[in-house]
Amino acid sequence: MAREWPMEQSPTLQAHLALQNADADCAAVIEALADAARELARQIAIAPLAGFDEGAATVNADGDVQKALDIVADNLMRDALRKAPVAGILSEEVDRPETVNAAAPLCVAIDPLDGSSNLQNNISVGTIFSIRPRGRDVLSSFFEPGTAQRAAGFFVYGPQTCLVLAIDHRVDLYVLHPTLREFVLARSGLRIPQDTPEFAINASNRRHWSGTVRNYVDECLAGAAGPRGRDFNMRWIASLVAEAYRILMRGGVFLYPADSRPGYREGRLRLVYEAHPMALIMEWAGGSASSGRSRILELSARSPHQRAPLIMGDVRLVRDVDQLHEGVEPLFETSDAPLFARRGLFR
């Protein structure tokens, strides 16, 4: 069970990392990211006044339309990381990794502003990062499996500005104190609540899903009268950091599967700087993360911006989805195919 820290006893991020004897290089990178996140939180707060929530008429390395604040966030994060012990940086906003100091011990993969399309709707957005050891060269460092990560985390810019940090096999929550302007420890040792009957998926894409995913969602929607024997709530925020935060606080399962649309057949989220860090956080908080067929942390990227499906959350609920995929040919079996017509977990 997570320990809650009263405000008057809460150590700062820097102090807590020192108390936990965190690796000095990792700590320096995390503190650099926190410095950038403080400024980014301020920029997000004034985005409608400064026009930062508008499009920048450009696309990033992966073909996504950029907001002006995407570029601001990328510059803030990379500028901060250049002052830390970092050999290379892989950002969602650039095509290839940037070499900073080839002799430094760490590399960082980052999505500087995840969910920026939500800015105009005043929905939480965030920064996701993965810290990993430098390999034989900067590029190859990002092609190691997710198990190689030294630390990972995400900032949430919402009602509070928070940092969820996975380091040394634990997950802690820090909140940006509005007066001190420091991240202070709010909860340590986060554990995902078990057996919460909630699932998150974008149901508008149902027609594009595999038969397996449709069958899983149908079983949840059938409720207490269906094969799963209980009522489920469905959630969808369309913000990866907000979805992950909710799972850490409430439990349940999040699904962003591959589907039949062009550009989605291998999943939509990026493996190195979205799925890998989220998987590390989930596992170290007692949960699980899968592609539906494989443990996310065991997957290795073949290209910097490779995509992957992501199912994460409560171990039991993730396992349920994995079991539905067993014996099913990848990847878009149809629900009216004879062998898989009504493959369900309970029949």
Swiss-Prot record:
The reaction(s) this protein catalyses: beta-D-fructose 1,6-bisphosphate + H2O = beta-D-fructose 6-phosphate + phosphate
The UniProt annotation places substrate binding at: 114-117, 202
Q: What is this protein called?
A: Fructose-1,6-bisphosphatase class 1 2
Q: Which family does it belong to?
A: Belongs to the FBPase class 1 family.
Q: Which cofactor does it need?
A: Mg(2+)
Entry-linked InterPro entries: FBPase_C_dom (IPR044015), FBPase_class-1 (IPR000146), FBPase_N (IPR033391), FBPtase (IPR028343), Fructose_bisphosphatase_AS (IPR020548)
Query: Which species does the entry assign this protein to?
Result: Bradyrhizobium sp. (strain BTAi1 / ATCC BAA-1182)
Q: Which GO terms describe its molecular function?
A: fructose 1,6-bisphosphate 1-phosphatase activity; magnesium ion binding
Q: Which GO terms describe its biological process?
A: fructose 1,6-bisphosphate metabolic process; fructose 6-phosphate metabolic process; fructose metabolic process; gluconeogenesis; reductive pentose-phosphate cycle; sucrose biosynthetic process
Q: Which PROSITE patterns match?
A: FBPASE
Subunit comment: Homotetramer.
CDD domains named in the record: FBPase
Q: Which keywords does this Swiss-Prot/TrEMBL entry list?
A: Calvin cycle, Carbohydrate metabolism, Cytoplasm, Hydrolase, Magnesium, Metal-binding
Where in the cell is the protein located? Cytoplasm
- State how the cofactor is bound: Binds 2 magnesium ions per subunit.
EC annotation from Swiss-Prot or TrEMBL:
3.1.3.11
Q: Name one Pfam family in it.
A: FBPase
Residues annotated as binding Mg(2+) 1 are 92, 111, 113
The taxonomy runs:
Bacteria, Pseudomonadati, Pseudomonadota, Alphaproteobacteria, Hyphomicrobiales
Q: Which Gene3D superfamilies match?
A: 3.40.190.80, Fructose-1,6-Bisphosphatase, subunit A, domain 1
SUPFAM superfamilies attached to this UniProt entry: Carbohydrate phosphatase
Q: Which GO terms describe its cellular component?
A: cytosol
Report the top EC class in one word: hydrolase
Query: Which pathway does the protein contribute to?
Result: Carbohydrate biosynthesis; Calvin cycle
